[in-house]
Amino acid sequence: LSSKLNSRSPAFTRIELVVVLAIVAVILVLSWPAFKNALTKRDLTQTMNNGRELYLAAFRMATDGAANSDSNLAWPGDYPVNSLAEYSSRLVEKDYLKPADLQRMLSAPSAACTVTATGSPVTTTLTGKSTLKIYKVKRTDPSNTIFAASSNYIYDTELNAKVEPFGDAGFIVVRKSGDAGVYKKGQATAAGYDNNAARFQAEIGALPGATKGEVASGDGATVLAGPR
């Protein structure tokens, strides 16, 4: 009798192992969406922090320019530049950011941007995809003007699930005041604020040069061109 029981034990062990593995697989499948969502929220928060760090460098440069009447130190919209690379050159040349720090700020797991700075005066080259885009904010723009946003967001436009980074999982905005936030897809347009344009501009932000209480979809020419 003992020999029969011993001969069956390995079989029972294998069956139990298969059952346990099947249960684990089911748990993993069911928990994956929540796990993926948690990772995305983490990456969005990190991107928001990176955007605010970039904002602080821009703020210091513009403030120094205003204090010293130096037009070489200004907000992005007060320069005759049209690309993020050109504006980045100003930040690096004036030593408000190091190339390695800028590269970290402009990158995310699904959007890596490589920053190369050469020459004197410094010329900065950006390759890949920037996770952040910078708006042409001017000294005269109000504090709720958008300074930066994640690259998947187009002003007052629904998020596209196919656009990296983050798809339609959410987006980030950093305003000229320094306030920043992570937002859900339902907050991407004025429709998410009962089509109250003034409220949308107050909570998400306004485009550079925008009229208070008037919202137009799209970024238009208000964004510095990113790497291609």
What are these regions (language model features)?
Residues 1-7:
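N-terminal secretory signal peptides that target proteins for export/translocation
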Residues 8-39:
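N-terminal single-pass transmembrane signal-anchor helix
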Residues 29-86, 227:
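Conserved hydrophobic/amphipathic alpha-helical signal-anchor segments
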Residues 31, 47, 69-74, 98-110, ...:
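A structural signal for short, well-ordered beta-strand segments and their strand-loop junctions
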Residues 82-93, 127:
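Well-ordered, non-membrane alpha-helical segments in soluble/globular domains
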Residues 94-155:
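Acidic, glycine-rich loop-and-strand cores that form catalytic or ligand-binding grooves
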Residues 154-228:
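C-terminal accessory segments of extracellular proteins
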